[in-house]
A protein has these predicted regions:
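Structural signature of alpha-solenoid helical repeat junctions
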Residues: 1, 12, 86-89, 110, ...
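Substrate-binding groove/exosite segments of carbohydrate-active enzymes
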Residues: 1-4, 82, 163, 216
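Aromatic-rich carbohydrate-recognition surfaces in CAZymes
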Residues: 1-51, 262-277
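Structural helix-adjacent loops and short alpha-helical linkers that scaffold large soluble proteins
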Residues: 3-21, 101-116, 167-181, 220-233, ...
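Short, structured segments at the rim of ligand-binding sites
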Residues: 21, 120, 255
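Extended ligand-binding clefts on enzyme/binding-domain cores
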Residues: 24-91, 103-104, 112-211
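Membrane-embedded hairpin module used as a gating/binding unit in multi-pass transport
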Residues: 93-99
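C-terminal capping/lid segments that line or modulate ligand- or cofactor-binding pockets
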Residues: 150-170, 207-283
Length: 283
């Protein structure tokens, strides 16, 4: 985080503390989305993924301890309201809020509340986001609390692939490794293999289009220098001669791509370059 990297406490004004309070209150309300939340989103004359069903409230959910999401990082509507990567990130962020509350604001009450909330979300994930009756335990992408699960991953961040990147667990965690194997395979309906590349795409873009951002994240979450280099080379070879990283490209025809300039993907690619170079120096 910025604070961990710089030690700069000046950014933590009273307004930021109020924002922390608003985050906790909002997420707690959305733990009970169906009964307590006033949020809805309705849009007409649009694809189904651009609006929420059930008169704007989304599909029904049961209480789990997780917090509800209407939309994914891709801006597509969730199928089931508990988006697991986002809840994992929320658990991490709540821990960060607790740390700042103690160290900067000297507010032990807020810190304890954030810590307890973080643990509640994590316990719900570890209890209810694991696919039942499988030989190995791995995480679903979305659940609804009624027993419905969605097995997939989306290139947009946060994702299941990126779990170690945002600090929910390390990349040696058994459930993460099991999940990684699933989402980097045909078990993920948005994993595509072609003549030029293979990787994770998104329902937000076309079939058989994969996202360089997911390739970069595959490298960033690997300990293998060989895999990191392979992802760098794959991204560079599929830039359609533009010297830029695109949103997505066709696995058979990389010159067929979306967004000629996608700064999010360019940034994650650059981070992988730095990560790879840094490790090479260490080695």
């Amino acid at each position: 985080s910025y604070y961990e990297a710089t030690g700069d406490e000046t950014v933590f004004s009273p307004e930021v503390k109020k924002a922390f309070r608003r985050i906790l209150d909002t997420w707690k309300t959305e733990q009970h989305h169906d009964n307590e939340s006033s949020y809805y989103f309705r849009r007409i004359n649009c694809p189904p993924t651009d609006t929420l069903s059930n008169d704007g409230k989304g599909e029904p959910t049961a209480y789990t301890g997780m917090t509800w999401s209407g939309f994914r990082p891709s801006d597509d509507a969730c199928v089931y309201g508990y988006l697991i990567p986002s809840n994992m990130l929320a658990s991490v962020i709540l821990g960060n809020i607790a740390e700042i509350a103690r160290e900067i604001y000297n507010d032990e009450k807020l810190a304890e509340e954030a810590d307890a909330f973080s643990e509640e979300v994590r316990n719900a994930i570890e209890t209810l986001a694991i696919l039942p009756a499988q030989k190995t335990e791995y995480y679903a992408y979305e659940v609804d609390g009624f027993g419905q699960y969605l097995v997939m991953d989306d290139a947009n961040l946060p994702s299941l692939l990126a779990i170690p990147y945002y600090g929910y667990c390390d990349n040696k965690n058994e459930r993460y490794q099991n999940t990684r194997k699933v989402i980097l395979s045909d078990q993920n309906p948005y994993y595509f293999s072609g003549e030029c590349a293979k990787g994770i795409g998104s329902p937000h873009t076309y079939t058989r289009f994969i996202w360089p951002m997911a390739l970069a994240m595959q490298g960033l979450t690997s300990d293998s220098m060989e895999e990191k280099l392979k992802m760098l080379e794959r991204i560079a070879a599929c830039d359609a001669g533009t010297d830029l990283v695109h949103e997505s490209f066709h696995v058979d025809h990389p010159d067929d791509f979306t967004r000629p300039w996608f700064s999010w993907a360019n940034s994650v690619f650059c981070e992988l370059v730095l990560d790879y170079c840094g490790q090479k120096v260490t080695l």
